[in-house]
Amino acid sequence: MNYSKAKYIMGAAKVSQLPEDTGVEVAFAGRSNAGKSSALNTLTDQKGLARVSKTPGRTQLINLFDLGNNNRLVDLPGYGYAKVSESIKRQWQSEMENYLTSRKCLNGIVLLVDLRHELKEFDSLMIEMAISFDLNLHILLTKADKLNNKERAQANRMIESFLKTFVSTDKISYQLFSSLTKMGLDKFKEKLDTWYQ
């Protein structure tokens, strides 16, 4: 798959506004400041494709990017400490859950986790939903360039023990990743390629 061909299609506030439910979609999800926009920009080799915001939680729409041949990347709203009301946060979460449960063309979720921090409730929720709906899930442990080898090994052990608390499934995988140094980029592309086949 040539990810550099990605083009922005649209942003939708509701699942009902999304294009026809055909082809293949891979959704990117993550807490605010997990490095989601940076990862999308690195994957597509386009600096400005997904807007990198200095204000966490600015991604409020479901943003779609076309890869050609009815394949799409989907940028889900950043979840976390956005400066919006609780009711709007609940609305975002409701739409995100609606997307994950109802979109038949969704073939996998990329969950971005800043490996400098412990996994949070949102991360657990995403893993549980992926297992419940039998979806592929690939966890990108972002900002790996900010840790030394010993700290990276500790992060790997942390995610391994964390995943052991869930039902065992071969549909969940994880890796270290850095948008800055492109560490893990080739491995990430290989994983996505299998989902778009």
UniProtKB/Swiss-Prot annotation:
It comes from the Bacteria. The gene is engB. One of its GO terms (cellular component) is cytosol. Residues 22-197 form the EngB-type G domain. Necessary for normal cell division and for the maintenance of normal septation. This is Probable GTP-binding protein EngB. InterPro entries: G_ENGB_dom, GTP-bd, GTP-bd_ribosome_bio_YsxC, P-loop_NTPase. Keywords: Cell cycle, Cell division, GTP-binding, Magnesium, Metal-binding, Nucleotide-binding, Septation.
